Amino acid sequence: IGMTFSTKTKKWDAEITTEEKWEKQMSDLTSVFIPAKEILSNAWNLDAAVKMGNVEFDDTYLDIIAAAKIDISRGVDSAARKKYLKILQQISSGKVTLHEDRFYLKPGTQAKLEFNLVAEGLRKIALLWQLIKNGTLEKGSVLFWDEPEANINPKYIPVLAELLIMLEKEGVQIFVSTHDYFLSKYIEIKRKSDSNVQYISLYKDEMSKVQCEIAKEFELLEHNTIMDTFRQLYREEIGVVL
């Protein structure tokens, strides 16, 4: 698919080529975008407010709320789904519930908590739990996640990386945008030798045009501001010690 637009292009007016072929191939595809900012705590009556024009929100926020509201499938979880949920329980044992358009987190036998009373990092993990539990994320689906590491306790980054690797292995295509060294390296460490994980770096050349670089290993990226900053910190730390 090809798309052409400029700063003057109005919404939905971009020039698109080969759209029909693309739509036919992707007609049965389930995809979800998780923004860097957690939104479920603000879900109450948001759809109605947007439709009435009282507030303006990016459509991606409305999409993720709609995906999270999908009823949790009845019956026994599949073996793959059980594996995912077991990993997430290392971070949070709570389960997501929806009541009167409000999201709650119910930790074990404790009383349910409104989402806005829960730490933002745990809200993001709870959202992931919900998307796995209700079948939004399963084999053949696509996940776009902007800065998964944001507001996550650093000690849980390895758990998050392990879950992403498992989802990828089971057939979920994942696109992650990150500025975090630890998440990038843990994904590299935990992946298998036959993994299809690739690292992509977007940068501007001398003409200020956006270029793309792809590598199988994180440190093989020539345009890698994450590694550059990490090395700079290491040199400065050594300088302080010496």
Task: List the predicted regions and their residue ranges.
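Walker B motif beta-strand of ABC-family P-loop ATPases
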Residues: 142-144
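C-terminal lobe/lid and adjacent interdomain/linker elements of RecA-like ASCE P-loop ATPase modules
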Residues: 159-242
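Short, contiguous clusters of charged residues that form electrostatic/catalytic patches at enzyme active sites
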Residues: 123-126, 158, 162
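Walker B catalytic acidic pair
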Residues: 146-148
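Phosphate-coordinating catalytic segments in nucleotide- and nucleic-acid-processing enzymes
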Residues: 1-140, 205-242
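Conserved D-loop-proximal element of ABC-family nucleotide-binding domains
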Residues: 153-154
